[in-house]
Design a protein with these regions (language model features):
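Charged DNA-binding/catalytic regions of mobile-element recombinases
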Residues: 1-252
Length: 252
């Protein structure tokens, strides 16, 4: 059993972040008939620990433009989506590098938690969140009147240029209240996952912004979307969950 566990945690540079719950799910996917408690016991005995949130970590605050109210909240904390491209959630966060701050903006599809667009920039500007949105629009098929785009009331997301881009694409803008992380919990959840498993993983440092961007590319496009399994998706990765949806005869 130890050999199988070590193999699960060795298939990718980020697989070592798996704790016993995900290791157990992956073993079940591979056909092992093993109990979750046994996996926990073996990993504890051999000091195999997964990633965990460091104490004291907090997400950054939102700065609302004083003259912009933002769109109404169309979700009211209900982030469930019956199909892809029905609800997208967005946020931005910052990473520290040897060259200074690098801001990351992302767009996440609520159906399978897949990151459908992201962008980086040294500054948290409207151009940054527009770049992430354009990445998402280029990678997905969006139908007019079917998609809600939810964010906080940050100045970047309430900027006229950004709102107009949504309207032009046939997307309904939605914003949560100021200072309440629960109103954009699905988007912010990505940051805790990314920082636990990448940014704060022991030994991780970014000498340059380019180095950080390359690490994000490996994590998001090479691990999180295609391979990182989630209990809420039935032990599938976001890509696998969407593929299963497409192959379901009821959704063709």
């Amino acid at each position: 059993m130890l050999e199988a566990i070590v193999k699960v945690r060795s298939v990718n540079e980020f697989a070592a972040t798996y704790g016993s719950p995900r290791v157990w799910l992956e073993l079940r996917r591979q056909g092992f008939r093993v109990g979750r408690k046994r996996v926990e016991r073996v990993m504890r005995t051999h000091d195999l620990q997964g990633a965990h949130l460091r104490r004291g970590w907090k997400h950054g605050s939102t700065r609302q433009h004083p003259e912009r109210r933002g769109a109404p909240d169309l979700l009211n904390r209900d982030f469930r989506a019956k199909a892809p491209n029905r609800t997208w959630v967005a946020d931005r966060t910052r990473l520290i590098t040897g060259e200074g701050v690098l801001w990351l903006a992302s767009v996440r599809d609520a159906f399978a938690n897949r990151v459908v667009g992201w962008a980086v920039d040294p500054r948290a500007t409207t151009e940054l969140v527009l770049a992430a949105l354009d990445h998402a629009l280029a990678s997905r098929q969006v139908h007019t009147g079917q998609l809600i785009f939810h964010s906080d009331k940050g100045a970047q997301y309430t900027a006229l240029r950004f709102t107009q881009r949504l309207v032009d694409a046939g997307i309904a803008p939605s914003t949560g209240s100021v200072g309440d992380s629960f109103d954009n919990a699905l988007a912010e959840n990505l940051w805790s996952t990314l920082k636990i498993e990448l940014v704060y993983w022991p030994g991780t440092t970014f000498a340059t912004r380019a180095e950080a961007e390359h690490a994000l590319l490996r994590y998001i496009d090479g691990w999180y979307n295609p391979r990182r399994i989630q209990a809420g998706l039935g032990g599938l990765s976001p890509d696998e969950y969407e593929q299963a949806h497409r192959q379901d005869p009821e959704h063709r």
